[in-house]
């Protein structure tokens, strides 16, 4: 179900906007993404050959993003539209051929599902927590954990897929895109070595998260999730689940709770008070905090935040 609807007057506005766009001339490849993380990767690869717009902001819940007239104008203008997939955007973009979907309402044949300008990145990455059976028993993660970009290995895979897609749309710029990818990949490899060195003393440390967003990240950096504050992805906390989680945190001596900026803090703080744990606010997307300005600084911020709190809790002694 699509939660957003667009007023009928928008048709008039869109018609006017289309005429303006057509008269503006070629300004390079216009790319729209569902998330800021995709936008950052597109910018790294596309460089000055693309203009990139994200429909969401990094401090928003990427599962539930308001769609407005500006969103549809951006979609109408796009040569390429990228999505995270795995039903991440289902609640606000819909799927298939639904007439209520903003993708259908934007009246841009270039980016309709199945066209060259519609690109779901999820088939190109490693997805964790894939269920044996696809049901809503997995909450809003019915196809597995859709926050896969938080693993830098997947960041590289995403960038490679974006390189191939941009090259298909702009063959004359293919060499440029490949060069940009090589620079991105080398920089990411250098930073991964630094991140691995920083986090290595804390392999096996246990955390609780608000939302099941960190599966790929925790697996990549060898940390352990004991549970989530949400009973299922996207389902609000309840007393029964919270009480069980508190008991388990005490039993396993979990002292860190990861919370993204888009979530409420009342429940995490209550749990922290009852368990002696610390609430650590970590962005799950580019722009989630001011210092997370691109893909590299997002992961840098998250790693540094975790290392700092682990150091404090361990008294500087590694186990």
Give the residues covered by each predicted segment:
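Bacterial N-terminal signal peptides that target proteins for export
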Residues: 1-10
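Extracytoplasmic metal-acquisition and chelation regions
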Residues: 24-319
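Bacterial N-terminal signal peptides
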Residues: 9-19
């Amino acid at each position: 179900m699509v939660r957003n609807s667009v007023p009928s007057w928008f048709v008039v506005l869109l018609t006017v906007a289309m005429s303006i766009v057509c008269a503006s001339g070629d300004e390079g490849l216009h790319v729209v993404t569902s998330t800021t993380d995709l936008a950052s990767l597109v910018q790294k690869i596309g460089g000055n050959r693309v203009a990139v717009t994200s429909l969401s902001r990094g401090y928003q819940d990427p599962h539930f993003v308001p769609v407005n007239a500006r969103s549809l104008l951006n979609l109408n203008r796009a040569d390429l539209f990228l999505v995270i997939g795995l039903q991440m955007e289902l609640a606000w973009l819909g799927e298939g051929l639904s007439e209520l979907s903003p993708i259908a309402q934007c009246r841009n044949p270039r980016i309709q599902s199945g066209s060259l300008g519609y690109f779901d990145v999820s088939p190109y990455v490693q997805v964790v927590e894939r269920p044996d059976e696809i049901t809503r028993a997995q909450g809003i993660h019915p196809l597995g954990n859709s926050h896969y970009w938080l693993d830098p290995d997947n960041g590289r895979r995403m960038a490679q897929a974006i390189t191939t897609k941009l090259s298909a749309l702009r063959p004359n710029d293919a060499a440029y895109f490949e060069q940009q990818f090589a620079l991105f990949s080398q920089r990411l490899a250098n930073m991964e070595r630094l991140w691995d060195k920083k986090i290595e003393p804390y392999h096996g440390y246990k955390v609780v998260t608000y939302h099941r967003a960190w599966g790929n990240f925790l697996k990549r950096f060898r940390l352990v999730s004991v549970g989530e504050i949400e009973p299922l992805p996207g389902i609000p906390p309840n007393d029964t689940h919270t009480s069980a989680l508190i008991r388990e945190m005490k039993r396993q001596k979990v002292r860190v709770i990861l919370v993204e900026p888009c979530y409420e803090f009342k429940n995490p703080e209550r749990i922290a008070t009852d368990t002696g744990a610390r609430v650590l606010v970590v962005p799950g997307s580019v722009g989630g905090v001011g210092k997370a300005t691109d893909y590299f600084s997002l992961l840098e911020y998250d790693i540094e935040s975790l290392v700092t709190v682990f150091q404090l809790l361990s008294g500087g002694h590694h186990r």
